[in-house]
Amino acid sequence: MSEQAQPQASADQQQHQHNHHHHHHHHHHNENQSQQQVPIDPAANPANRIGRYQILKTLGEGSFGKVKLAQHLGTGQKVALKIINRKTLAKSDMQGRVEREISYLRLLRHPHIIKLYDVIKSKDEIIMVIEFAGKELFDYIVQRGKMPEDEARRFFQQIIAAVEYCHRHKIVHRDLKPENLLLDDQLNVKIADFGLSNIMTDGNFLKTSCGSPNYMPAPEVISGKLYAGPEVDVWSAGVILYVMLCGRLPFDDEFIPALFKKISNGVYTLPNYLSAGAKHLLTRMLVVNPLNRITIHEIMEDDWFKQDMPDYLLPPDLSKNKNSKIDVDEDVIRALSVTMGYDRDCKIVNVIEKANKQVAAGNSSSQQSKSSNEILDAYLLMKENHALVKDLKKSKSENIESFLSQSPPPSPFPNRGSTSSAPGVQQSLTYQTLATVPDLSTLPNSTIAILPTSLPSIHRAYMAETKQNGDPSQQHAPPPTKKSKTRWHFGIRSRSYPLDVMGEIYRALKNLGAEWAKPTEEELWTIRVRWKYDTSAQFECGSAPNLMKMQIQLFQLEPNNYLVSFKFSGWESAHGNAGTDSPQSHRQQDLDEVGSFSAYPFLHLATRLIMELAVNSQSG
């Protein structure tokens, strides 16, 4: 494992970084220290320690919890600890899904993606041990201004290769921005927050985070369309390339609505000093209509992009492997058994044999079960990781050590839940790794898989091509069925003017005695509702929550066609802290029962709202 040297920074630079990060969470920080990593005395400050990691400082806070800088007691290697609060996850009913997705993300091994080394679980927290990078591309641009095209292209090639790698394995970032692009000591890009902070949860068609005027969301994100797909990453990568080449943002306005209008209209200028090739690529990426936007694979075929392209960044030739037999690699199987908890004979080998039989018969592997497809995806991903490492070792690059995907630091946490610690050190919590995963049948279905695009016309064309040619990379395609003209949507559709639709919803909510939060400027088409529901029939304890929360959101399906979506958002007590008089165990039991006893309260209130809307439309 190559040790990572930390950059030196002046007080002014540190202050700039502090000001810049006040609304972000990251896995890096500039340190005033020598470049040599010195192991920490095992007896030092045991209270501020998690396992064999000594916590040094807090780097920031995210939506799930805090991010801390830590150092391994034995090796002195610095890592970032992303500490996720289980209670926060439980409120959104995401814990099982997050654990499953984290275990999948542990398999991601690309030279230009921040690596998830390990996952530690305690009773109250899930702790992710993450690769630590000390610099940020944003600061590099601020200090140097616009870059020469050769330098910008080198960074851009690394970014696109990492994005392509994740898209190929059904993960989309959706939050690419300079702050998420870190640099190691060899000035190689490391993309942070790939996957975890952008988990596509059921019921959330779109999850935006516009915390800064510098954030450049894609036009389809701003318009609030029913959409979440890889085209968003292409737009963001185009913005990043523009910033590197021009030293400024393509769209800039201190007034957020004016900024979003410029983005939606695609209003930007290209400096004359840019080469024709750079201009051509930017104009293909910064396209308002995602249907016409260049794809990641088309970017990788662009002449300007391909100049001086290192071989290790080239994706594998999938066309050669489309109908080829899958080899059984014992090293990969062994690693997959440890990482994901799959049984060798009953699970992994069996799935590979079934897939090979289907290939031999000319059938698609999509006919396998969802859990089998998941195992096959994980096996192929890890097999590609092994091949990537072999290719990198053959490379003649001078900075090969910084390219190699590092292994996790030596973990003191055995797979079966026991925790070792330094002699004389008493730990307040017992941690276990996530290496042994429960049976797949006990966990929610993973939502990490995505379609190549959610856009209707492209999706229809893609599915038609898949049906004709077959595509093992899209493991989750359903078997061919008779084409139906019926179009299904979750929610109710309307062709009325959007503001009229929202007005009718507010009027119906008022008539039914519901409450709602005042919407922010960024969420004009979202209503957060609180509705009293009678729980007295189910619970004798007065501490049981009786306010059901619902989120109502308006989406645009196509021109002049809109969708109203209803989503259950949990429970809340009408008595505030009045329930604290009852024992904690009783309150938790009530909460558990309310959260699991039935879906009918939500369906009942949603039905009442839909009926009220129908009555209002008839009377109007």
Curated annotation (Swiss-Prot):
Residues 1-45, 399-424, 466-486 are annotated as: Disordered. ATP binds at residues 59-67, 82. Keywords: ATP-binding, Carbohydrate metabolism, Kinase, Membrane, Nucleotide-binding, Nucleus, Phosphoprotein, Serine/threonine-protein kinase, Transferase. It is a peripheral membrane protein. The keyword Membrane applies. Residues 466-476 have a biased composition (Polar residues). Its EC number is 2.7.11.1. The active site is at residue 175. Residues 17-29 have a biased composition (Basic residues). GO terms for biological process: CAMKK-AMPK signaling cascade; cellular response to glucose starvation; establishment of mitotic spindle orientation; fungal-type cell wall assembly; invasive growth in response to glucose limitation; negative regulation of inositol phosphate biosynthetic process; negative regulation of TORC1 signaling; negative regulation of translation. PROSITE patterns: PROTEIN_KINASE_ATP, PROTEIN_KINASE_DOM, PROTEIN_KINASE_ST. The modification Phosphothreonine is found at residue 208. It is found in: Nucleus membrane. InterPro entries: AMPK_C (IPR032270), KA1/Ssp2_C (IPR028375), Kinase-like_dom_sf (IPR011009), Prot_kinase_dom (IPR000719), Protein_kinase_ATP_BS (IPR017441), Ser/Thr_kinase_AS (IPR008271), SNF1_UBA (IPR013896). It catalyses: L-seryl-[protein] + ATP = O-phospho-L-seryl-[protein] + ADP + H(+); L-threonyl-[protein] + ATP = O-phospho-L-threonyl-[protein] + ADP + H(+). It is an enzyme of class 2 (transferase). It comes from the Eukaryota. The keyword Glycoprotein does not apply. Residues 1-16 have a biased composition (Low complexity). GO terms for molecular function: AMP-activated protein kinase activity; ATP binding; guanyl-nucleotide exchange factor activity; identical protein binding; protein serine kinase activity. GO terms for cellular component: cellular bud neck septin ring; nuclear envelope lumen; nuclear membrane; nucleotide-activated protein kinase complex; vacuolar membrane. Residues 53-305 form the Protein kinase domain. Belongs to the protein kinase superfamily. CAMK Ser/Thr protein kinase family. SNF1 subfamily. Essential for release from glucose repression. It interacts and has functional relationship to the regulatory protein SNF4. Could phosphorylate CAT8. This is Carbon catabolite-derepressing protein kinase. The lineage of its organism: Eukaryota, Fungi, Dikarya, Ascomycota, Saccharomycotina. The gene is SNF1.
